[in-house]
From Swiss-Prot:
Pfam families: CbiA, GATase_3
PANTHER family: COBYRIC ACID SYNTHASE, DETHIOBIOTIN SYNTHETASE
Purpose: Catalyzes amidations at positions B, D, E, and G on adenosylcobyrinic A,C-diamide. NH(2) groups are provided by glutamine, and one molecule of ATP is hydrogenolyzed for each amidation.
Top-level taxonomic group: Bacteria
Residues forming the catalytic site: 334, 421
Keywords: Cobalamin biosynthesis, Glutamine amidotransferase
Gene3D superfamilies per UniProt: 3.40.50.880, P-loop containing nucleotide triphosphate hydrolases
InterPro entries given in the database record: Class_I_gatase-like (IPR029062), CobQ/CobB/MinD/ParA_Nub-bd_dom (IPR002586), CobQ_GATase1 (IPR033949), CobQ_N (IPR047045), CobQ_synth (IPR004459), GATase_3 (IPR011698), P-loop_NTPase (IPR027417)
Entries under SUPFAM superfamilies matching the protein: Class I glutamine amidotransferase-like, P-loop containing nucleoside triphosphate hydrolases
Protein family according to the UniProt entry: Belongs to the CobB/CobQ family. CobQ subfamily.
Name of the protein this chain belongs to: Cobyric acid synthase
Every GATase cobBQ-type domain range: 253-429
Length: 491
């Protein structure tokens, strides 16, 4: 099948970014290209339109990769999405719809259904597109997981996908990581690994060149290029690994503090605020980090009641109360909004074992979790302008008399709550919200244009620093025969 697997030496090596960049570069050549990730583990997701207009849920990274490919996002691009609710249990989204829950203890029993679904989805995309660029997960050399793998070399073997391995040289040890990754694969898997891409390089490429030649010599495989480190390259992330680096580049006059919840979800909701020149956006997990904030955002979460208990245990509830008492604005999004209400009920244990918890009482609303997940792409009016977003939630909101309607949620003075993710990406709504809360005039920033510029920048870097023609030929024709075996191979 025409396609390519982008594997990595580690998590956060650059697989999502490289996949998006290749999608943009291939699309520029007139190739009908689709992104794919068999299984994504992330609480950052997106709603797109499914069959019959119903909403379906996929990983945020695959949604952005589809934009890079100039393709319409769909469930087949991320057939299995795991949304962790605890360290040992995940909610499973299968082909965009809620499927149930899996615990780590019974993972292998449920894996067969997930693998078959993922393989069918890939085959479907491959039949409709010229090339499918598949993103792996973690590392293909996780030898304890290979028997049940359908995301890395398991997928590559299913579809006979040539594979490239990307490594983050900024961490150090990238040559050992490249060699070790291949040397821990079976002979069958090694035969599909065509070469490497070095990511996040800083410095003089001439100093790196001897190492690249030696790597090609000892592995018998090509280095397809070296991507430079670039400060402005961040895209919508799939997990929380890079939260510590997600700060606005500006040192704006107004400080926005985002509560870093343990099970934070859809933290991309604040990306648009990070582009505003008058705002400095930071993540905080203790009261001191909230103390001098002009605006506080409580984001979404996959475990609302559990994260509310965490918030109280750290004294963040008192910090939020003091912030509101000082007349400063507070915004809660989805689960963060539900925390601001009077009570949260979970009678069926949708999110966890606690059936009911008192909220912070800042908004006159009550939340009750239902078994069926709501997936919608709402549009409406907010603060006098047209607004839109996306909804992903089990919570049903009942508003009291004191609650003023606001984007599927409620408002009381300077306390705002919405069930709409992504609403701040709308330029008109964001401008109106910042004028209402902080007295800011519009900056003229277009979030969608900024995302498109970043995708174009990524495409430019891929075109400039990688052998795109060779990678496209690899995707179309597969690996060269008789690639050398590196011992010892899989145990």
């Amino acid at each position: 099948m025409p396609g390519l697997l982008v594997a990595g030496t580690t998590s956060d090596a650059g697989k999502s970014t490289l996949t998006a960049g290749l999608c943009r570069a291939f699309a520029r050549r007139g190739v009908r290209v689709a992104p794919f990730k068999a299984q994504n583990m992330s609480n950052n997701s997106m709603v797109c339109q499914g069959p019959g207009g119903a909403g379906v849920e996929i990983g945020r990274a695959q949604w952005v990769q589809a934009l890079a490919a100039n393709a319409t996002p769909e469930a087949a691009m991320n057939p299995v999405l795991l949304k962790p609710g605890s360290d040992h249990r995940s909610h499973v989204v299968l082909m965009g719809r809620s499927w149930g829950e899996l615990a780590s203890s019974n993972w292998f029993e449920g894996r067969q259904v997930l693998a078959e679904t993922a393989h069918r989805a890939f085959d479907d995309l491959a039949a409709r597109y010229d090339v499918v660029v598949a993103e792996g997960a973690g590392s293909p050399a996780e030898i304890n997981l290979r028997a049940g793998d359908y995301v890395n070399m398991g997928l590559a073997c299913h579809a006979e996908l040539p594979t490239i391995v990307v490594g983050d040289i900024d961490r150090g040890g990238v040559f050992a990581a490249f060699f070790g990754t291949i040397a821990l694969l079976s002979a069958e898997d090694q035969a599909l690994v065509a070469g490497f891409v070095v990511n996040k390089f800083r410095g003089d490429l001439d100093l790196l060149a001897p190492g690249l030649r030696d790597l090609e010599g000892v592995t018998g495989r090509q280095v397809f290029g070296t991507l430079p480190w670039h400060a402005d390259l961040w895209l919508d992330s799939e997990d929380a690994l890079d939260l510590t680096g997600r700060r606005a580049a500006s040192t704006g006059a107004h400080r926005v503090a985002v509560v870093r919840l343990p099970r934070i979800s859809n933290f991309t909701d604040v990306d648009a605020l990070g582009l505003e020149p008058d705002l400095d956006v930071v993540f905080a997990s203790d009261p001191r980090g909230l103390g001098d904030a002009d605006l506080i955002v409580v984001p979404g979460t996959r475990a609302t009641i559990a994260d509310l208990a965490w918030l109280r245990a750290r004294g963040l509830d008192r910090a939020l109360m003091a912030h509101v008492a000082a007349g400063k604005p507070l915004l809660g999004i989805c689960g963060g909004f539900q925390m601001l209400g009077r009570v949260i009920r979970d009678p069926d244990g949708v999110e966890g074992p606690v059936a009911e918890a008192d909220g912070l009482g800042l908004l006159d609303v009550e939340t009750t979790f239902g078994a069926e997940k709501v997936l919608r792409l709402p549009r409406g009016q907010g603060l006098g302008v047209t607004a839109s977003g996306y909804e992903i939630h089990h919570g049903r909101i009942t508003a009291g008399d004191a609650a003023q309607q606001f984007l599927g949620g409620a408002r009381d003075g300077q306390v705002f709550g919405t069930m709409w993710h992504g609403s701040l990406e709308g330029d008109a709504l964001r401008e109106a919200f910042l004028r209402e809360t902080l007295g800011l005039t519009g900056s003229g920033t277009s979030f969608s244009a900024a995302r498109e510029r970043r995708l174009d920048l990524l495409g430019d870097l891929v075109e400039r620093h990688l052998d795109v023609d060779a990678l496209l030929a690899l995707a179309r024709h597969g690996c060269a025969p008789a690639l050398p075996f590196l011992p010892p191979g899989a145990p």
